[in-house]
Regions:
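Intrinsic-disorder/low-complexity loop/linker signature
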Residues: 3, 24-25, 101
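Short linear sequence elements within intrinsically disordered, low-complexity coil regions
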Residues: 11, 20-22, 93-95, 109, ...
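Beta-sheet-rich sandwich/jelly-roll-like modules and their strand-loop junctions
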Residues: 7-73, 78, 129-149
Length: 149
């Protein structure tokens, strides 16, 4: 992956999340260490402070795209959904790239789709969840691209 004007992906660490059969739920993506079910952890502990600099997502499956509504996502720390979160939204039909069949991808950096770089501290648990459903989703993969201080 190359660089953009604002984000040098070669200097970033990536943290992977996924969820199968999301449906219309507002649920956490999981760390897929042998699956992505409820028993899997839903966050990565951060070894030092830093910032989420970018997000890449892949949505796939027969229900994708399902509507022309925005799907709203929330990056949060330590399971707290009420304060100190970063939300962004996109429409699968108009904002994502259809790479093949029912596979749609997007890369979001600072200033796009309502996203601003998101700061965290050492020891924080970094999580992502869909906070508002724009319709049914099948499979979602997400990478949070992080730069440590």
């Amino acid at each position: 992956m190359g660089s953009t004007e604002f984000t040098d992906f070669n200097k970033l660490q990536k943290f992977y999340y996924a969820r199968q059969d999301m449906g219309t739920g507002t649920v956490d993506l999981r760390i897929p260490n042998g699956g992505d079910g409820e028993a899997n952890l839903n966050g990565h502990p951060m070894p030092t402070s830093g910032k989420v600099k970018a997000i890449t997502m892949l949505c796939s499956g027969p229900d994708t795209p399902s509507t022309s509504n925005d799907h709203t996502w929330m990056i949060r720390k330590n399971g707290n959904s009420s304060s100190n979160t970063e939300t962004f939204a996109f429409d699968i039909d108009t904002d994502m790239t259809n790479t093949n069949g029912t596979n749609y991808t997007i890369t979001i950096v600072d200033g796009q789709h309502g996203f601003s770089e998101y700061s965290f501290n050492a020891g924080d648990l970094l999580q992502i969840r869909r906070s508002s459903s724009g319709g049914t989703l099948d499979n979602v993969n997400c990478v949070l691209w992080v730069m440590f201080d």
